Each structure stands twice: as structure tokens, then as C-alpha cells.
Amino acid sequence: MTHLSLADPVREPLFSGEAGRQTAMAKDILAEAGLHFDELNKLRVLDPEVSQQTIELKEECKDFVDKIGQFQKIVGGLIELVDQLAKEAENEKMKAIGARNLLKSIAKQREAQQQQLQALIAEKKMQLERYRVEYEALCKVEAEQNEFIDQFIFQK
């Protein structure tokens, strides 16, 4: 394995082309070993592209978590709203059931009252028939008595 030193005071100065080639070779050797230089020329274990992608992924994850938090708040609000509407619907349902039962009760009361009135009408009709029969009987008695009186007066 070849070891290169970027700063070697013993060597004589190299031409810029050759120095660039040696620097590139050194970077390639370090890259093969899993070491890389970043934009500030600091030695890193991760490839700068991978590092940048990691940072971007971390930011995207943070944004995603923030959006999930907002989504959960919105969903929580919707759930509360739906629960409130369900309670109101249940209350209205109970009111409707109560009103229906009240109407049934009123209908039954009216039916009972109607039956009572019909029974009273039937009773009054029977009483009227008795009075009519009694009246006819009294009219007959009156006619007989008037006839008797007339006969009595004419006989004298």
C-alpha cells in the first residue's frame, strides 16, 4: 500500500499539474479507505453527497413530523366536532322520541275521551228515549183524563 503525505517538506516542489494529480490520487486512496474531504477540506467518514442527503432527509423528516403534528391537531379538532355533533344528534333524537311518546299519549287520551263521550251520548239517548216513552204515556193519560173530564162535564 502506498502512503502519500500532502505536506512533505523533504520532497522538492512539484509542478502544479503533477501536484493536482497526486492530490487526486490521495483523495482516491482515502475514498477507497472510506474517508472523504468536505467543502471545508475537513476529513469525514461519510461521503459528502451521503452527508448532504442525510441532512436533507433529516430536514424532510422534521417537516414530515411537523405536518403529522398539524394533521393530528386537525383530526383531533374534527373528532371533537363529530363527538359534539353526535351528542347534539342524540339529544335531538331523545327530544323526538319524547315528543312522539307525548303525541301517542295525547292520542290515547283523546281516544279514551271520545269513548267516554260516546258512552255519555248513548246514555243520554237512552234517557231521551225513556223520557219520550214517558211523555207519550203521560200524553195518553192526559188525553184519557181530558176525555174523562169532558164526559163527566157533559153528563151533568
Curated annotation (Swiss-Prot):
Source organism, top-level taxon: Eukaryota
Position of the signal peptide: none
Listed GO CC annotations: acrosomal vesicle; centriole; centrosome; ciliary basal body; ciliary base; cilium; cis-Golgi network; cytoplasm
Keyword Coiled coil applies: yes
Location of the protein in the cell: Golgi apparatus, cis-Golgi network; Cytoplasm, Cytoskeleton, Microtubule organizing center, Centrosome, Centriole; Cytoplasm, Cytoskeleton, Cilium basal body; Cell projection, Cilium
Self-association and partners: Component of the IFT complex B, at least composed of IFT20, IFT22, IFT25, IFT27, IFT46, IFT52, TRAF3IP1/IFT54, IFT57, IFT74, IFT80, IFT81, and IFT88. Interacts directly with IFT57 and KIF3B/Kinesin II subunit. Interacts with IFT88. Interacts with CEP83. Interacts with SPEF2 (via C-terminus). Interacts with CBL and CBLB. Interacts with TRIP11. Interacts with TTC21A. Interacts with SPATA1. Interacts with USH1G. Interacts with CCDC146. Interacts with CEP78; regulating IFT20 stability and localization.
Physiological role: Part of intraflagellar transport (IFT) particles involved in ciliary process assembly. May play a role in the trafficking of ciliary membrane proteins from the Golgi complex to the cilium. Regulates the platelet-derived growth factor receptor-alpha (PDGFRA) signaling pathway. Required for protein stability of E3 ubiquitin ligases CBL and CBLB that mediate ubiquitination and internalization of PDGFRA for proper feedback inhibition of PDGFRA signaling. Essential for male fertility. Plays an important role in spermatogenesis, particularly spermiogenesis, when germ cells form flagella.
This protein's name: Intraflagellar transport protein 20 homolog
UniProt organism field: Bos taurus
